[in-house]
């Protein structure tokens, strides 16, 4: 193991490893239940703002823009704890979720399970109740 790898894996210096697009993957879970709420991406600015403010900030690949969770919907995330994985290319935030995490109005983005069916797969809705109407909130 190189000295650099050892420092990344065992050291106390936070040195996030951004991908070629300048992003790290972020997994957000509910601090109270442990449920996975969403998977998103952070650039350096989103990561710094999240650490500084205690609010979740992300980078939207589709909009190519920084955004604070809840800035439009009011469905915010207060960060209780942030962790990084062994090689510092992903972060996990444990949050107090206010309302829904998903832009579809659901508590979690993981509201469908994949089930085997006739050699293929199908989706089945689970925990899919909407907490808000996305058309009303986002004025689509």
Swiss-Prot record:
Q: Where does Zn(2+) bind?
A: 86, 102, 109
The catalysed reaction is: 1-(5-phospho-beta-D-ribosyl)-5'-AMP + H2O = 1-(5-phospho-beta-D-ribosyl)-5-[(5-phospho-beta-D-ribosylamino)methylideneamino]imidazole-4-carboxamide
> What are its E.C. numbers?
3.5.4.19
UniProt xrefs under InterPro entries: PRA-CH, PRib_AMP_CycHydrolase_dom, PRib_AMP_CycHydrolase_sf
Q: What's noted on cofactor binding?
A: Binds 1 Mg(2+) ion per subunit. Binds 1 zinc ion per subunit.
Q: Does the keyword Transferase apply?
A: no
User: What UniProt keywords apply to this chain's record, in alphabetical order?
Assistant: Amino-acid biosynthesis, Cytoplasm, Histidine biosynthesis, Hydrolase, Magnesium, Metal-binding, Zinc
A GO BP term here is: L-histidine biosynthetic process
Cofactor(s) recorded for this entry are: Mg(2+); Zn(2+)
Query: What do we know about how this protein assembles, alone or with others?
Result: Homodimer.
Q: What's the protein here called?
A: Phosphoribosyl-AMP cyclohydrolase
> Per the UniProt entry, what species is this protein from, by scientific name?
Bradyrhizobium diazoefficiens (strain JCM 10833 / BCRC 13528 / IAM 13628 / NBRC 14792 / USDA 110)
Q: What is the lineage of its organism?
A: Bacteria, Pseudomonadati, Pseudomonadota, Alphaproteobacteria, Hyphomicrobiales
